[in-house]
Amino acid sequence: MKIIPILLIILTILEQGYCQDKRGQQWIIGSYRGAIVEFQDTSRPIVNPVYQTPPFYFTQGHSNICDSTTGRLLFSCNGMILYDSNGVIMDNGDSLVPPNAYNHSFFPNALYTQSSLILPKGSNGEFYVFICTITDLMYDYWYTNPLGDGRFPHDLLLYNIVDMNANGGLGKVVEKNKVLLQNVELHKIRMQACRHHNGRDWWLLKQGRYGTNEMYRFLVRPDTILGPFVQTLPSPAYSTFDLFGQMAFSPDGTKLAMVHCKMQELFFADFDRCSGELSNPKIVSIPTDSTGIPNAAPQYIMDSVIGGVCFSPNNNFVYVSKRYNIYQYEWNEPDSSLALYRVQHGPDTTYLPFQNYNSLHNGPDGRIYIGNTAGQFKQMSVIDHPDTKGAGAGFCRKCLRLDDTTAMAFTSPPGLPDFNLGAASGICWPLSQSESEVRSAEWVVYPNPSSTVFIVQNKQGKKKELYNVQGELLFSTKEDVIDVKHLAKGMYYLRVEHEVKKVIIE
């Protein structure tokens, strides 16, 4: 009778612990040289130019991670190279992508939005570093046979493992260029992660190939990575130029939003932290507005490119950045005519050519920071009160600043997941089961159907037997994760302690 109260106490403690996570407390930003943005409290963050050896390319595809307790910077990634906390290339941290992606002169791998992401690998000082890139074979083909309209698909998703216990805390790459997904065309942008319902594991999402609605997801655990699981959505099927665009989860982990640079729309859907699946998708039209530039040349009259997306800390609003305009969308407003508000119209500088608003990111101080496509200055504009509807959101022009003579420029915030999202309350059941089924069930198998693995919940240490439809025993195991990639498609029966469930391999 005391199990449920004790479980709730444990879950509460876990959630409180994760809510105090400081892994995103400092940011690395800047092109040509790097700077650390140090968030202290609710006052303006401090900017310190510390990385003095170019080229660093902390422009669009970069990421970093800090100590969960102190907020001290541990290491950073620019999409191609890992740097330790001193700005020196980490031991075995160079050449994390194939040679052509590394050396491409105009757009190396470091310049693609959300092309790298860092996640903790448990609590032992190890970390996963995920990078989306392109093989030399694919590069050579598309460079001589371009798709047109700036499209250049990637076909390789890699991960590396960093051990921060090595080299006196400066870290070392102990597993390098491990293949997670290959021989599949992928968008070169949009990769993000959200904590699993259990507060320990992560769901990693990566958008699939051009012209499809495929979303690849992986369950990232301390001991292994499961997947890929593939979900086909009703929309969007992006097939145009994809240098810019972003994917973002809401702070409570229940929503996902995406934008694509040449599509005048916002994709919005519910997200299930148990299954990693998206549901109830919808498309919100974003106006093709004027740039707001006085006496503009013809190519600068209309604003038709979207760069970034971000949720407000209270989950109620989605912010969308175009090159010259920033919009606030209230997703739960029943009157659609009142749901969209333009927070900013026109550039944040009188100097032209203005370098355009780009990706957005929540800061640890509750503000939203607005990146620049190819910044020429050491400033970044900020939304000071993103939880407030309309004009009260408070666009603050170039309020993140570095006023010294350092030769560098601010571009975009790093690609970070929400480390502050904790475990959710209740038991994590598959999305397909109704609440009544959940209450009566003693154990469950998910995902079902599956093409890779079945995960058995609430039967730890028990023998699991898999039978074909002829009743022949195929194998037995006590593991909770059952690998079925070697089996043919079709229906099977999973037996655990005299109870049988039907499972489908697809």
Give a label for each model feature.
Residues 6-9, 17, 54, 149, ...:
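Generic marker of residues within folded, mature protein domains
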Residues 1-25, 255, 290-292, 304-307, ...:
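Bacterial Sec-dependent N-terminal signal peptides
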Residues 437-446, 450-506:
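C-terminal outer-membrane/trafficking sorting elements
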Residues 20-433:
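Beta-propeller fold recognition
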Residues 3-10, 417, 462, 483:
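Terminal low-complexity, poorly structured segments
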Residues 15, 19, 343, 456-459, ...:
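Intrinsically disordered, low-complexity regions enriched in polar/acidic and amide residues
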